[in-house]
């Protein structure tokens, strides 16, 4: 009887660990679009889902999934987003270390650090990317295309080009205190 109890507890622990790892990531669907492919027999319908995945602690990714049903497309988008994760260096006040720009297709995104208490001032897919990356104080401006996918990719590129103060100091061969 005691062995059965131990087995149940250990399986519960295993299940808890699994759900903890899964719940660490947040997923937000930015867009679901019905797309068609013209084939010999007519038109074939499918769905495209743009999904942003992040842990709100400096990791974020954008994924695209296509399937004949919405749930399958979202599932594929989540898997794709987890494959294309980017690490974002965050400052103590949950902002970014310096201004940055990124391009994705015809979309261009400018992001700038903001003072504590400012919040995320951005729109559309860019806002979702920044929130799921864990950035709490930032200003962003979207230029060019209004496509959610290109804007999300541009925001991801801008975040991936960020460097920490330590990296900059190391590349210049100076102490970190000299940067401030």
Curated annotation (Swiss-Prot):
One of its GO terms (biological process) is translation. GO terms for molecular function: rRNA binding; structural constituent of ribosome. Residues 25-88 form the S5 DRBM domain. Pfam families: Ribosomal_S5, Ribosomal_S5_C. Residues 1-26 are annotated as: Disordered. The N-terminal domain interacts with the head of the 30S subunit; the C-terminal domain interacts with the body and contacts protein S4. The interaction surface between S4 and S5 is involved in control of translational fidelity. NCBIfam families: rpsE_bact. With S4 and S12 plays an important role in translational accuracy. Located at the back of the 30S subunit body where it stabilizes the conformation of the head with respect to the body. This is Small ribosomal subunit protein uS5. The lineage of its organism: Bacteria, Bacillati, Cyanobacteriota, Cyanophyceae, Synechococcales.
């Amino acid at each position: 009887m005691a062995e059965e109890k131990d087995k149940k507890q250990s399986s519960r622990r295993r299940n808890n660990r699994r759900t903890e790892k899964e719940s660490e990531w947040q997923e937000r669907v930015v867009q679901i679009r019905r797309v068609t492919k013209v084939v010999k027999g007519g038109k074939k319908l499918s769905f495209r889902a743009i999904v942003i995945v992040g842990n709100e602690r400096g990791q974020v990714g954008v994924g695209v999934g296509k399937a004949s049903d919405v749930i399958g497309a979202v599932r594929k988008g989540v898997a794709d987003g987890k494959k294309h994760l980017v690490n974002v260096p965050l400052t103590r006040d949950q902002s970014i270390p310096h201004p940055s720009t990124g391009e994705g297709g015809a979309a261009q995104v400018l992001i700038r650090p903001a003072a504590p208490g400012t919040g995320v001032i951005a729109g559309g897919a860019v806002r979702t990317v920044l929130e799921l990356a864990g950035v709490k104080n930032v200003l962003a401006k979207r230029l060019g295309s209004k496509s959610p996918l290109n804007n999300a990719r541009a925001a991801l590129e801008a975040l991936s080009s960020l460097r920490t103060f330590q990296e900059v100091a190391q590349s210049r061969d100076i102490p970190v205190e000299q940067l401030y």
